[in-house]
Amino acid sequence: MSIHIKQSTMVRPAEETPNKSLWLSKIDMILRTPYSHTGAVLIYKQPDNNEDNIQPSSSMYFDANILIEALSKALVPYYPMAGRLKINGDRYEIDCNGEGALFVEAESSHVLEDFGDFRPNDELHRVMVPTCDYSKGISSFPLLMVQLTRFRCGGVSIGFAQHHHVCDRMSHFEFNNSWARIAKGLLPALEPVHDRYLHLCPRNPPQIKYTHSQFEPFVPSLPKELLDGKTSKSQTLFKLSREQINTLKQKLDWSNTTTRLSTYEVVAGHVWRSVSKARGLSDHEEIKLIMPVDGRSRINNPSLPKGYCGNVVFLAVCTATVGDLACNPLTDTAGKVQEALKGLDDDYLRSAIDHTESKPDLPVPYMGSPEKTLYPNVLVNSWGRIPYQAMDFGWGNPTFFGISNIFYDGQCFLIPSQNGDGSMTLAINLFSSHLSLFKKHFYDF
């Protein structure tokens, strides 16, 4: 698909901002490699009659000038996003130098319908999400990049490339909400808090009370012959209606559990089982379920301030053999998920912070496999609490929100319906040879 870049603007904060270095916690640094951004897209389909949605000060649907001006104002309280990474000794910092965020305005001769259901893929990412050149060094590229793309049908997309060292998805969408509110002439809903050292520094002396295997590489050695013919990967979407979710939950044996299981716990357990069955591994092989968890509500001694802007993502991990996942009921599997999530309390997370800081060479947790490596584990990332409906810049709510590209086999995202009908969509990357079996098991209930 063709795309034409009309202009690229480095948007600086509208006012003078603090010129300082911002300390990053190990939690900030280990979720992604420093030479990478995370992509997401918002889709807005222009209404047939949009008189009530158009900004009164603009005759253009999604006026770039309004968005750029609002972005410049939003970068004042969120000034680290206008900075650059730098290295200080053995760790990264954010140089809050106000160099700016990249805003790209583009247009395409295609229509939004050409992208079908907006499943994540390389082409969607290429067309809708901005990129940068990493070859010039760690301080050369912006930490936030945004692209407004107009399509022939009148609809638009806003693609984000966000650097994970700056903040996690929740903080990023709080920033987007502030940007959207400013574009409508409103004040930001939250005042961001950027001091990571004050709130997430390690204790002295460290108090490591648990074994934190979730911060170690997750790739075990598997027989090479299992890889034969499995070099092509596919990204796709699988939808679960409210009725299907209720049917799945009705299959649970509630007599064997003393607590109620949440929808996420049930669906995540179901995905874990379905992927395990689809891969055709031996019964004795272990398969882990890895779940990124927002620690904001779990850290309470002391609690994080409202508006904390940084990474508060920790990993909950369940382990089972392929045979156990196939034979045991879903109630047991979902119970394992619940148990792993409950274990991430304040005491455990503070211990995890101390553990990460005590390991100077701690690697990025391996959340999937590179090309030509068979990876037995599954990562299920929930986007259920992301306020995507707050992304109204003055022209109405998005009609779609999702990840733009999933790079690793076994990585998936659970995204709730945008229309509030109780359904959810699973975006997943698997080897192409596993997809048909996964679909069979995923809908077999």
Curated annotation (Swiss-Prot):
Q: Which residues form the active site?
A: 164, 392
Q: Which UniProt keywords apply?
A: Acyltransferase, Flavonoid biosynthesis, Transferase
A Pfam match is Transferase
Molecular functions per Gene Ontology: anthranilate N-benzoyltransferase activity
- What does the record note about the induction of this protein? By fungal elicitors. Elicitation triggers a rapid, transient induction, reaching maximal abundances within about 0.5 hours and returning to basal levels within 4 hours.
Catalytic activity, EC: 2.3.1.144
Regarding how it is modified after translation, the entry says: N-terminus is blocked.
Q: Which GO terms describe its biological process?
A: flavonoid biosynthetic process
What this chain does, per the record?
Catalyzes the formation of N-benzoylanthranilate, in the course of methoxydianthramide B, a phytoalexin. Phytoalexins are produced in response to infection by parasites, and are essential for the expression of disease resistance.
Task: Check the record and name the PANTHER family matching this protein.
Answer: SHIKIMATE O-HYDROXYCINNAMOYLTRANSFERASE, TRICHOTHECENE 3-O-ACETYLTRANSFERASE
The text of the family note is:
Belongs to the plant acyltransferase family.
Q: Per its record, how is this protein called by name?
A: Anthranilate N-benzoyltransferase protein 3
> In which organism is this protein found?
Dianthus caryophyllus (Carnation)
